[in-house]
């Protein structure tokens, strides 16, 4: 099943007939594979690890699938006839994607942008740098818009540092330097949930620790500030978050293993601690299901004397799930928005 933006692209396949195509920020479908019906070859870069997993099983000699904030070094200088960008949910990320696309186009190369009507794509003309021609709307279908532009002059060389902000953050463990890549949400201050978590960290945390949904690495950096002996693994599905986490660790002269994982699927072994401000707060049924799976998998992945501590929106129904899988619910702190759950075996 193709998403609406992908269906809109298929309607406009005439723009990439027999082209070598780069697809940036693709969605959780197999459009890039179906694109081979029209294109000569396709290279796809996902910024969401789940989207990458959806497509990677279809990879072949004419379809290359990658995950990350940019293509591998071996493809850094590769040019394509056309670059397709799916308009991102985080609007500021579009500027980065436009410059990234330009690195892989020759002058006069074609840029195709697709996005949902209500997703911000109508502002594309204001967002497009002057090294592209003015984007022209080519189609309005499936509640989506399709624009085409061309590279009219060479773009500045992309430096990821130009798309990363760094700031000092005060935490209960001390001052940290936090790096935020574009597209990663940050208030540039400690949010209520993370503040509650860091204010009540267990002092007996030891060994191998998992930071689930690490974001920019605030929790990991605070943990290592308090206890440099910890062996921490940081996982997320967002490429820009993983990049942010790596840069945050470097800025604080800290080390941890940072890698993508779809839930616990890419993780091996058990942990002495799982500490998290998990990324499910909206209360939707699908989100609640993911949260339930998180608790269930946490119980499996925790060592016999492990520590599990998470902070979550107080309205989310964690208590019943925690009782089912851990046997006891301990709320060690709370405020008007969040609850802090702790389980020590």
UniProtKB/Swiss-Prot annotation:
Function recorded in the entry: Specifically methylates the guanine in position 1207 of 16S rRNA in the 30S particle.
Gene Ontology terms, MF aspect: 16S rRNA (guanine(1207)-N(2))-methyltransferase activity; nucleic acid binding
The family this protein is said to belong to: Belongs to the methyltransferase superfamily. RsmC family.
InterPro entries tied to this protein: DNA_methylase_N6_adenine_CS (IPR002052), Mtase_sm_N (IPR013675), rRNA_ssu_MeTfrase_C (IPR023543), RsmC/RlmG (IPR046977), SAM-dependent_MTases_sf (IPR029063), Small_mtfrase_dom (IPR007848)
Source organism per UniProt: Shewanella frigidimarina (strain NCIMB 400)
Coiled-coil region(s): none
EC number: 2.1.1.172
Keyword Kinase set for record: no
Subcellular location per the Swiss-Prot or TrEMBL entry: Cytoplasm
Alphabetic keyword roster: Cytoplasm, Methyltransferase, rRNA processing, S-adenosyl-L-methionine, Transferase
Keyword Methyltransferase: yes
GO CC, alphabetical: cytoplasm
Gene this chain is encoded by: rsmC
Protein name from the UniProt record: Ribosomal RNA small subunit methyltransferase C
Catalysed reaction, written as an equation: guanosine(1207) in 16S rRNA + S-adenosyl-L-methionine = N(2)-methylguanosine(1207) in 16S rRNA + S-adenosyl-L-homocysteine + H(+)
Subunit structure as annotated in this protein's UniProt entry: Monomer.
